C-alpha cells in the first residue's frame, strides 16, 4: 500500500502488482517465485494473485511451476517420512549435529509433525552441502527418500520430487514378490521412469528382536547411511 500511495497520481507510474504467499501456512518455494516473475512478464499481469494454494473459488492463484533444485552439485537433500515416537526425528537431529560438528559440510534441517505427536505423521527435511545453505524452504527435490511406514505409500505422495537416479528406502514387512505386488502402480512407474534405486528392510521386526521396541531409528538410519 505504501508503494502504491507513492506513485498514485504521478505520470509514467510503473505497473504495480501485488499478491499473497504462505496462505494456510504453505511453504514458499522457488517454483512459486518463478510463477510470480512469469506473471509480471505478461502484457496484463494478474493483480492480487496468490501462490502456494489452488484457489478454485476466486481463481486468483498463479499456475504451479515444476519444482527445481537450486543447491548445485555439492548439495545433498533427503526426506524421511516417519511415525511419531519411532525415533526418526531424534536420529536425524543427531545426524545433523554429528555431521556439522565433525565434517566441513554445511547442514540444515527442518522437521514437521502433526498434532498427535506420538503415533502421528512426521517428516524430516535434511540438507548437506559444501557451501552455505540459503534455502529457507522445505526439501522438494530430494536425492534420497526414506519411508519408515509402509502404509504411507497409499496415504501420501512419498516419491514426489525424488530426483532422477535417486534412492528410496522402505521399512516394510513385504519382500520379494509380495513387495512387487503391494507397491502402488504409480510408485513402481515412478521408480522405473526415473531409474530409482530401491532398498527395503523389515526394521520393525529387527528392532523388536533386539529389544528396541518400536524404536526403528537405529536400524533405518544405519541402512540410510549404507544406501
Q: Can you name each region flagged by the protein language model?
A:
Residues 150-152, 174-175:
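Short glycine-rich anion-binding loops that position phosphate/pyrophosphate groups of nucleotides
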Residues 166:
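Glycine-centered, small-residue-biased loops immediately flanking beta-strands
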Residues 77-141, 145:
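Anionic-ligand anchoring segments at beta-strand to alpha-helix junctions in alpha/beta enzyme folds, i.e.
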Amino acid at each position: 500500500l505504501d508503494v502504491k500511495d507513492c506513485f498514485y497520481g504521478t505520470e509514467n507510474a510503473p505497473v504495480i502488482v501485488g499478491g499473497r504467499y504462505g496462505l494456510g501456512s504453505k511453504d514458499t518455494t522457488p517454483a512459486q517465485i518463478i510463477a510470480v516473475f512469469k506473471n509480471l512478464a505478461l502484457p496484463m499481469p494478474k493483480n492480487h494473485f496468490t501462490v502456494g494454494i489452488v484457489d478454485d473459488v476466486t481463481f486468483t492463484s498463479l499456475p504451479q511451476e515444476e519444482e527445481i533444485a537450486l543447491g548445485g552439485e555439492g548439495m545433498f537433500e533427503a526426506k524421511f517420512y516417519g511415525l511419531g515416537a519411532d525415533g526418526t526425528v531424534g536420529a536425524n537431529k543427531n545426524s545433523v549435529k554429528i555431521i556439522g560438528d565433525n565434517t566441513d559440510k554445511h547442514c540444515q534441517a527442518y522437521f514437521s509433525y502433526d498434532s498427535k505427536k506420538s503415533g502421528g505423521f512426521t517428516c524430516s527435511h535434511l540438507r548437506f552441502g559444501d557451501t552455505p545453505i540459503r534455502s529457507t524452504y522445505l526439501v522438494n527435490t530430494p536425492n534420497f527418500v526414506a519411508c519408515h511406514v509402509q502404509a504411507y505409500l497409499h496415504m501420501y505422495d512419498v516419491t514426489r520430487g525424488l530426483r532422477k537416479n535417486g534412492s528410496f528406502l522402505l521399512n516394510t514387512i513385504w519382500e520379494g514378490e509380495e513387495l512387487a505386488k503391494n507397491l502402488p502402480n504409480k510408485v513402481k512407474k515412478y521408480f522405473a521412469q526415473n531409474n530409482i534405486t530401491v532398498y527395503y528392510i523389515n526394521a520393525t521386526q529387527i528392532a523388536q528382536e533386539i529389544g528396541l521396541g518400536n524404536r526403528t531409528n537405529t536400524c533405518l538410519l544405519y541402512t540410510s547411511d549404507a544406501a
